[in-house]
């Protein structure tokens, strides 16, 4: 039996596709081993979101070949789409598989081991409207399942290469999504997270059928066994009164919304080619707070974007504090060859990016603590996931619908028996900076 090892780089969509490829290999008779072990096949699902991501992808490919020079090293994913010519010349890489062709992994390996000259499976995504059918019937995480429902992006933000490496928007058939979710529910999963490259574009290619993102959500809400539905990153403009009102009527929806912002300065947003203003973004947050009680609103922020002045940054900081997020993912701007932002003048020095990041991370810590504190004394239900030791005492941790982490005392109970079960109680004091104690009823 041949051994295969896989390594994922990048986003949740990539992670989903890596698990799907792993299951394809298992079904074909491969033994899946750790990437640290010697294997006959190494598959690296690459990322190309920044120049640094490109470098990491190359490093992992060479690391795999160094582990076993006789192994077949497969480069898959976004870096393949961005740099296929370079990979064809790289002696560490044997096979290359682009996005929308990952289902070809096993046939490509079969051809390799049969001595055939086929070395790649790549398509030009610019003109492709085909959604690649990849399925998962089990996941590495045993309580929360990520479901890819959409691929591609039509937004063309000035700093982003993804529309070129992932192609235009392509949606997964709703009945196909339903089938996978039903299988996962039968496997015992109680929570799903819908994910995609530009999630809220779901259904724009199904307009003639009257199918949109909300349609999909409502259909999944009807599936027995699934108790919670979360979303990946959402486009702020999807948050309308109608959308929020409809969601608020669905009890399985988690009031946890990640609205990608990137900057709190209108001038910077314009240079980024984001399609909203700060005022419009703030209005969307208020709509969510109108229809959901104390929802968790999280976001992404890029600091040090080309031409961002000290005044621009201060405008962003003030805006973030005003909106008051639960969590913020703060990224120093990282150049990506092939994007408009990479060619922009007035690139910000790395030292300035680092300083600005530190300011926002300090603000994030403050706001996050304040949001968690707002739940103290409230009755909550958490889905238990894993044990943790705090001050020599063992607890079982889980999350509320808002993704606030809490823990119960085990008191001698078997953590395996508690995993993936719900427990209710009153949230109390902090056990750590990020974990509240849940006093069971």
Describe each region flagged by the PLM:
Residues 259, 300, 320, 328, ...:
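Hydrophobic, well-ordered secondary-structure elements that form the walls
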Residues 156, 160-167, 228-237, 263-274, ...:
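Conserved strand-turn element in the central/C-terminal portion of the radical SAM core barrel
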């Amino acid at each position: 039996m041949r051994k295969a090892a896989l390594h994922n780089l990048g986003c949740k969509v990539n992670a989903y596709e890596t698990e799907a490829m792993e299951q394809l290999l298992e079904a074909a008779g491969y033994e899946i081993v750790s990437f640290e072990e010697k294997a006959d096949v190494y598959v690296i699902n690459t990322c190309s979101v920044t120049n640094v991501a490109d470098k990491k992808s190359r490093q992992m490919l060479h690391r795999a070949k160094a582990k076993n020079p006789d192994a077949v090293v497969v480069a898959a994913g976004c870096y393949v789409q961005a740099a296929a010519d370079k990979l064809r010349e790289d002696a560490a890489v044997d096979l290359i598989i682009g996005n929308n062709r990952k289902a070809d992994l096993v046939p490509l390996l079969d051809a390799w081991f049969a001595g055939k000259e086929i070395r790649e499976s790549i398509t030009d995504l610019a003109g492709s409207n085909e959604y690649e059918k990849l399925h998962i019937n089990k996941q590495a995480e045993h309580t929360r399942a990520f479901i890819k429902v959409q691929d591609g992006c039509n937004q063309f933000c000035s700093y982003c290469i993804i529309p070129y490496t992932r192609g235009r928007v392509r949606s997964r058939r709703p009945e196909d999504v339903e089938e996978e979710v039903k299988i996962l529910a039968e496997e015992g999963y109680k929570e799903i997270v819908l994910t995609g490259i530009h999630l809220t574009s779901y259904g724009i290619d199904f307009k003639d059928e009257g199918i949109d993102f909300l349609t999909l959500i409502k259909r999944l809400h009807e599936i027995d066994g699934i108790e919670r539905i979360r979303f990946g990153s959402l486009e702020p403009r999807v948050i309308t009164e109608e959308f929020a009102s409809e969601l608020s009527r669905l009890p399985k929806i988690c009031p946890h919304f990640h609205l990608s912002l990137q900057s709190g300065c209108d001038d910077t947003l314009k240079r980024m080619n984001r399609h909203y203003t700060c005022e419009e973004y703030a209005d969307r947050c208020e709509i969510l707070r109108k229809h959901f009680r104390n929802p968790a609103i999280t976001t992404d922020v890029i600091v040090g974007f080309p031409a961002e002045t000290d005044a621009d940054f201060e405008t962003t900081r003030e805006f973030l504090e005003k909106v008051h997020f639960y969590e913020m993912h703060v990224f120093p701007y990282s150049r990506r060859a092939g994007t408009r932002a990479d060619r922009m003048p007035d690139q910000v020095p790395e030292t300035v990016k680092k300083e600005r990041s530190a300011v926002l991370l300090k603000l994030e810590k403050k706001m996050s603590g304040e949001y968690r504190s707002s739940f103290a004394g409230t009755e909550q239900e958490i889905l238990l996931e894993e044990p943790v030791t705090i001050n020599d005492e063992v607890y079982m941790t889980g999350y509320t619908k808002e993704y606030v982490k809490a823990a119960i005392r085990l008191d001698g109970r078997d953590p395996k028996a508690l995993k993936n079960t719900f427990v209710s109680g009153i949230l109390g004091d902090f056990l750590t900076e990020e974990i509240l104690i849940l006093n069971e009823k």
